[in-house]
Amino acid sequence: MKQFDIIIWGASSFTGKLVTEYLFNKFGSSKIKWAIAGRDLGKLKKVRSQVADKNIPIFIADSFDEESLLKFIKKTKVICSTVGPYSLYGTKLVKLCVENNTNYCDITGEAHWIRTLIDNFHEEAKSKKIKIVNSCGFDSIPSDMGVYFIQNEMKKIYKTYAKSIKM
């Protein structure tokens, strides 16, 4: 049994603060078990004092240090990452989540990186029933809208939808 329901990785980032504030306003510190994580203890304490309360645990880690990431990945059901660029900081995190049966979500708009994740982690995640959910935010809207418009034009001109779209 994992100790936390969700941990926000990158809680001191602009979006991380918004996610932290939302979770606290929606659930407080007792309806679900959650924590915040990032690189800088001072910044995380500031976020916690501004938008949450002192009962929300803090984890410190470095995106390139597996051991520090595992200290919180192993303890939660879900990692919500707001740390980008994801192609630089996210691959190791996703790999460790899949290896440790932890679900993962992010707000990436990096379609090329999502393809890399699918190629590298989809089968193992699927076999373990681990969810990897990318683009859970505003950043995904431009690419989603582009695909939508391309598909509409394909249907109008060629009477069929594109089977795939490379970006």
Locate the predicted segments by residue.
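Short, conserved SAM-binding/catalytic segment
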Residues: K46-N55
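Structural motif
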Residues: D5, K77-V78, N103
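Conserved Rossmann-fold cofactor-binding substructure of NAD(P)-dependent oxidoreductases
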Residues: I60-Y89
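Conserved anion/nucleotide-ligand pocket segment
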Residues: V133-D139, S143-M167
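Rossmann-fold NAD(P)-binding glycine/threonine-rich loop
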Residues: T108-I130
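ADP-ribose/adenylate-binding Rossmann-like module
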Residues: P85, L96-I114
